[in-house]
A protein has these predicted regions:
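An N-terminal-biased, well-structured beta-alpha scaffold segment characteristic
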Residues: 1-13, 141
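Gly/Ala-rich phosphate-binding loop of Rossmann-like dinucleotide-binding domains
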Residues: 81, 85, 172
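Short beta-strand "acidic-cap" motif of Rossmann-like dinucleotide-binding folds
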Residues: 91-93
């Protein structure tokens, strides 16, 4: 939040809230596709002129009709929800205030008494698109990581503090 000294000194503040939402949402989609199809492996194979795909790659099922959890329904999260609908994905969302939203199949929220872990347990993808504050710091912690499917992908489009990094490392090593 803005410090009183800013106003006392007559400094003009402007905001471009939402201006980058389309690009950030596209970025999230790029990460989702890259993770789904193991883009680094495909790029290495192409560089090495290996045209036969591995059995593991050929068994990948894509994003079509999978479930995505959008955590934070601001402008970026809402745009992510809109874009993933082109893959006929089921969109679950977590937002502290919202009761319903366009392009979202079901909205969960703390003010409604919902449990974030219930949403996470259903998701093949989780996209974090919320601001970092006292309520969202480590919103993804050991309990949330444990609630997620072992095959789920986590895409953090917000600040690093949204995820408890040591808990994530532990979950990746032993989960």
């Amino acid at each position: 939040s803005t410090k009183p000294e800013v106003f006392e000194r007559g400094i003009i503040l402007t905001s471009s809230s939402g201006r980058s939402a389309p690009a950030l949402a596209e970025h999230a989609l790029m990460f989702m596709l890259s993770l789904t199809y193991d883009l680094p492996m495909l790029m290495r194979a192409q560089k090495e002129h290996k045209w036969a795909v591995s059995r593991e790659y050929s068994e990948k099922t894509g994003m079509y009709r999978k479930t995505v959890g959008v955590i934070g329904l601001g402008m970026t999260g809402s745009e992510v929800a809109r874009l993933v609908k082109s893959f006929d994905m089921k969109v679950l969302a977590w937002d502290r205030r919202r009761k319903e939203a366009q392009n979202v199949d079901q909205v969960y929220g703390a003010e409604n008494g919902d449990n974030l872990n219930e949403l996470l347990a259903q998701c093949d993808y989780v996209v974090l698109s919320l601001e970092l504050n006292d309520q969202t710091f480590h919103i993804i912690d050991a309990a949330q990581l444990a609630a997620m499917k072992k095959t789920a992908f986590l895409v953090n489009m917000g600040r690093g503090g949204l995820v408890n990094e040591p808990a994530m490392i532990e979950a990746l090593k032993h989960g």
